[in-house]
A protein has these predicted regions:
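ATP-binding/phosphotransfer module of carbohydrate and carboxylate kinases, centering on a glycine-rich
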Residues: 1-65, 76-78, 96-106, 119-129, ...
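Short beta-strand segments
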Residues: 7, 67-71, 110, 134-140, ...
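Short hydrophobic alpha-helix segments
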Residues: 28-30, 85, 155
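A short acidic/small-residue loop/turn micro-motif
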Residues: 31-33, 89, 158-161
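A charged helix-plus-loop insertion that forms the helical arch/lid used to bind
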Residues: 79-90
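A glycine-rich, Thr/Ser-enriched phosphate-binding loop motif common to dinucleotide/cofactor-binding enzymes
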Residues: 109-119
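Acidic, glycine-rich active-site loops and adjacent beta-strand->loop/helix elements
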Residues: 113-115, 139-141, 306
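Short, charged low-complexity linear segments at domain edges
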Residues: 145-161
């Protein structure tokens, strides 16, 4: 009983053979070559599907289904990628073409963030729940919503863009063109920008900060710089972390008040802070949520599937 998950990214295509226990039996990848025609990208996807089957001595005919997690607007009803800013897909029937190349195996598609959220709901931090949300704190803030046991993507399949809820009126400029989007305050990119700004502020004011020393040693500023400095007793590092977490909390409270999910799982680089992060934000979130102390509380958890979320989430799209 095997399924195949295809994690289609702007940089790499990763394909995994997933068993009935949601474990990846075999995984292979190749550069996407996003500048190429869509047909050529699908050729590589098909080849990887055959390769993982061959490595595990599984016949492609015995595959229950294949799922594709793709960036952009994915119409899961028709199997068409309506639009992707990172890939050459416009009204592109990706599911039909891949299915034909695989000998008729059923192919499902969805947005990559939705697929990751579905993976956490089926096999990860939200397993056993009927409603959940997953957010990914990386270059941006990705979001996926599971409502009544189904992926929520809106009537036009472009919903669940949680990173673009506005939390600061006329705030920081976002890549989407608007101002004040949550991802400009709560992504790993935003955290790095806050760290740089605080280091510059300290230099102007003649204050010392361990963040400068850490950056000199490592050669770069990362999402860990402020957290590591804070843990070492650095006041400026603590200021960065406190500011960052306040924005993260604001966005999470908004999500809870709108959807009241059973579980919110947090993935992406910032989630590597682990249980400390959950313990730090949990009290403020539930103090601020609507109906605090009266309604059942949403649980906040670290996502479990990590870097395999795309493959596993895609593989279980047919469930």
């Amino acid at each position: 009983m095997y399924r195949i998950g295809v994690d289609l990214g702007g940089t790499n295509i990763a394909v995994g053979l997933v068993d009935e226990n949601y474990k990846i039996v075999c995984k292979k990848s190749t550069p996407t070559g996003a500048e190429r025609e869509g047909e050529l990208i699908i050729e590589d996807m098909a080849k990887l599907c055959f390769d993982v089957c061959k490595s595990a001595n599984v016949d492609i005919k015995d595959i229950i289904s294949v799922g594709i997690a793709t960036p952009g607007i994915a119409n899961h009803d028709t199997g068409v990628v309506e639009y992707s800013c990172n890939l050459p897909f416009r009204k592109f029937p990706i599911a039909q073409i891949l299915s034909e190349k695989l000998g008729g195996v059923k192919v499902y598609i969805d947005n990559d963030a939705n697929a990751a959220a579905w993976g956490e709901a089926v096999a990860g931090a939200a397993k056993g729940t009927n409603s959940s949300v997953m957010i990914t704190l990386g270059t941006g803030v990705g979001g996926g919503i599971i409502n009544d046991g189904k992926i929520f993507s809106g009537f036009n399949f472009a919903g669940a863009e949680l990173g673009h809820i506005v939390i600061e009126h006329n705030g920081r400029k976002c890549a989407c063109g608007r101002r004040g989007c949550w991802e400009t305050y709560s992504s790993a990119t935003a955290l790095i920008n806050m760290t740089k700004e605080k280091m510059d502020e300290c230099q102007r004011e003649g204050r010392t900060t361990l963040m400068t020393e850490m950056t000199a040693k490592s050669g770069n500023i990362s999402g860990r710089t402020a957290f590591d400095a804070m843990r070492a007793g650095d006041a400026a590092g603590k200021e960065v972390v406190d500011t960052y977490l306040s924005y993260l909390i604001t966005g999470l409270v908004n999500i809870i008040n709108i959807f009241q999910p059973e579980v919110i799982s947090i993935g992406g680089g910032v989630s590597n802070e682990g249980q400390w992060l959950i313990d730090k934000i949990y009290p403020d979130i539930h103090e601020q949520q609507y109906g605090s102390g009266i309604v059942d509380e949403t649980k906040i958890r670290i996502a479990q599937l990590k870097n395999d979320a795309g493959i596993i989430g895609a593989a279980v799209l047919g469930m």
